[in-house]
Regions:
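Short glycine-rich, Thr/Ser-proximal phosphate-binding strand/loop in the N-terminal lobe
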Residues: 2-39, 124-154, 225
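Short glycine-aspartate micro-motif
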Residues: 3-7, 52-54, 109-113, 181
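Glycine-rich phosphate-binding loops at beta-strand->alpha-helix junctions
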Residues: 12, 171-203
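Short beta-strand scaffold segments in enzyme catalytic cores
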Residues: 13-17, 59, 101, 118-123
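Glycine-rich phosphate-binding loop and adjoining helix at the ATP-binding site
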Residues: 25, 29-42, 46-54, 59-108, ...
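A short, acidic, amphipathic alpha-helical segment used as a generic capping/interface helix at domain edges
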Residues: 160-173
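Short, low-complexity intrinsically disordered segments enriched in A/P/G/S/L with frequent Arg
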Residues: 221-231, 235
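Long, low-complexity, intrinsically disordered segments
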Residues: 233-243
């Protein structure tokens, strides 16, 4: 089964399909709607063959459907029929969860995605729990306001790096993971990593997208496992968005 993986971000939409060696991308931005995203993907992947679609979505997801419009994109994502738009079966998960799934090794792993915002996912013994930690209160705003793109632009790289260390330290102390992965496009700006952290490969978002359609054993539902190496269960934790 050939899979088309779509990684939707605040600045770019990146795609890769089974059997392809190079990803393709186009610009997104604060006005991009779900319909525009689909149109862009269909055009860019027009010469690719695929049977199913995985979408990494920058916001909370429940039962493979967005439950809130993304903070850094346009409107029209909630209730959008991706299956009808692509004409194929579609699974949607939080974008950080998709990259976390591709980064997971074992035990209890915390994934933090440093990009337009702050993506976050906890995986415990293969069970994937997407989270919205970026919207939790921090100092005078939220975690995302300090370590997301807005924080980087406002603070500058030196102060931003210090905030990343502080946020990582607080979340690690609260969640006590065995493994901490820092991913997202801005992770490369870090000169060094917080203690106990490893740098994630952003290509793992595509790996996670492929795993979403891996065949499940008979004892579990098709949505219940990501493959023989990782027992995954996509169970998004839905939080209301903070204004």
């Amino acid at each position: 089964m050939d899979v088309l993986v779509i990684d939707v971000g605040g600045t770019h939409v990146k795609i890769l399909a089974t059997g392809q060696t190079e990803k393709r991308e186009f610009d997104s931005g604060p006005k991009m709607t779900a319909q525009q995203m689909v149109a862009g993907v269909r055009k860019l992947a027009g010469d690719w063959s695929y049977h199913v679609v995985s979408i990494g979505y920058p916001g909370p997801v429940l039962h493979h459907r967005p439950v809130a419009d993304p903070k850094n994109l346009g409107p029209g994502w909630m209730g959008f029929d991706f299956r009808k738009a692509f004409g194929r079966p579609v699974k949607v998960t939080n974008d950080a969860a998709m990259q976390a799934l591709g980064s997971y090794k074992k035990g209890k792993m915390l994934f933090l995605g440093l990009g337009t915002g702050l993506g976050s996912t906890l995986i415990i013994d293969g069970i994937v729990e997407p989270m919205e930690l970026g919207h939790l209160p921090y100092k005078k705003a939220t975690y995302e306001d300090y370590v997301g793109e807005r924080g980087l632009e406002r603070l500058g790289k030196k102060k931003w790096r210090k905030e990343v260390f502080d946020v990582a330290d607080r979340l690690v102390a609260a969640l006590e993971p065995d493994d901490i992965v820092l991913g997202g496009g801005n992770a490369k700006i870090l000169k060094e990593l917080p203690p106990g952290c490893r740098l994630g490969d952003n290509e793992n978002a595509f790996k996670g997208g492929f795993l979403m359609w891996a065949e499940a054993p008979r004892s579990e539902s098709p949505a219940g496992r990501a493959g023989p190496a990782v027992a995954t269960k996509l169970r998004p934790t839905v939080r209301s968005k903070r204004s």
